[in-house]
Amino acid sequence: MNSAAIAVRPISTETVLQNHLRAAKIGVDAIMEDYTDESVLITHEATYRGLAEIRRFFTTLFGALPRGFFDELQLIRHEIVDEVAYILWERKPQIARATDTFVVRNGKILVQTFAVMQ
């Protein structure tokens, strides 16, 4: 069989989301594997563009959270529509509700929004 005829199956939005949720339990280096230098993360405080800015956001976030924080995260809602993933989650008592929306392209997070509701 000609190697050019072998198709590479694209990584699904669901796969990227599940990897992202697992990576959050591991740490910043693992979570950064889901992004590219074209990625954008939008929060209520700022917009972070590219790997360096997104890494800075997650380094600060992970430094402020107690060890094992993401192990206790409860997923309330999880919706995938084509290249868009939405999650609603809680981690009481610290976080009553939070949402993330992800736009996934080529197996990476292109755009993410993140908001916490107290």
Residue ranges and their predicted role:
Residues 26-38:
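Short, well-ordered alpha-helical segments enriched in acidic and aromatic residues
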Residues 45-46:
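Short, solvent-exposed loop/turn segments at secondary-structure boundaries
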Residues 50:
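Short, conserved phosphate/pyrophosphate- and ester-handling motifs at nucleotide-, phospho-/glycolipid
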Residues 1-9, 18, 22-25, 42, ...:
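A beta-strand edge to alpha-helix "cap/lid" segment located at domain peripheries
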